[in-house]
Amino acid sequence: MYFCDRNEKENLVMANFHHVVIIGAGPAGTVCGYLLQKHGVDCVIVDHATFPREKICGGGLTPKAYGLLQELMPDFRYEYQSVRRFKFMLEGKTISEVDLDNELRMVVRKDFDNELLQQYLSIGGKLVKGSFSRFEEQPDGKILVSIKSGEPLLCDYLVGADGANSQVRRQITGSRSYNTLWMEQYVEKGANEFIFELSKQYKKGYFFSFPSVGKDIVGMGGYYSSPKEIRAQLSKNHIRGNILAVDAPLRGSYIPLETLDSGKKQVILIGDAGGFANKLSYEGLYYAIVTGRNAWKAIMEGTDFSITNREIFRNKRKEAWVTDLFYSRFGLWLVRIGAHSPKLIKKAFEKCY
């Protein structure tokens, strides 16, 4: 059996050097990679999936999200369902219905993520199929990234954009960090309205119904530890009301909400890998896009991500205490009182998004 000597191993690694290695080809990683590639920075995205791939997500693009995406990628086109009607429910009863000034854009993540990736590839972006194993900081400051069943990669910056189950984050923290569980299913299209229901029975979460492209997505989530808990809650509140299809499968995903800075200038966590989902609404696409942009800025400027992403870290701290208040019994009481003013409900909803 032939073994490479040390010099050959070093040559192999150097042959696979990139200024930036991005783990994960979801929106956060692809936006970051697109901006780097567009500005002439050598980068590569690593992902284990074959695109297009399924993705569990409501798929809501808020005005902030699609506005920022338009600014960063003006040529990007994608299919979406426009929604302006918002129905707010409390304990199974409709308490307010409003028409939003700005549309919500509902996308199918399987298609949307693939279209984003194709946009990155169309400008010369590189994609490697493989699974992240671990990273090692080298004496010269570079980072050696091991890929399962693949050649190692050497880089100046490692960007962890590998989602809620991030292996990059897990290496840094030593454990998985899950806070909320969300489950959903596809049903036939109904009214073109966004339904949001709160209940004191729910664990810091809500029931939802989102119109999407060719179908609707319904489900619920919150601080639940297992699918069994959510299934029991849905059975009690919604299956009997014929909102969910009894024979359709429920798909689920955990979302980490503990925002994390890696503490290393050359290792950056973005999107769900960094715990950046909205702590109140649990929406993640805006924060995927904005943290992808902020990672690009940090790399281009040679500064810490904690600086370019300062405003987002500050927002996360604010969201934490607002969320605790909103989902408390006192918060639900305030919601009930405020429901008598549709203008107030509308303003609060648009403020969150």
Identify the function of each model-found stretch:
Residues 62-115:
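A conserved beta-strand/loop capping segment in the N-terminal third of enzymes
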Residues 29-30:
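N-terminal Rossmann-fold NAD(P) dinucleotide-binding loop
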Residues 134, 152, 224-298, 304:
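FAD/FMN-dependent oxidoreductases across multiple families
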Residues 119-245, 259, 275:
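Predominantly flavin-linked oxidoreductase catalytic cores and closely associated redox partners
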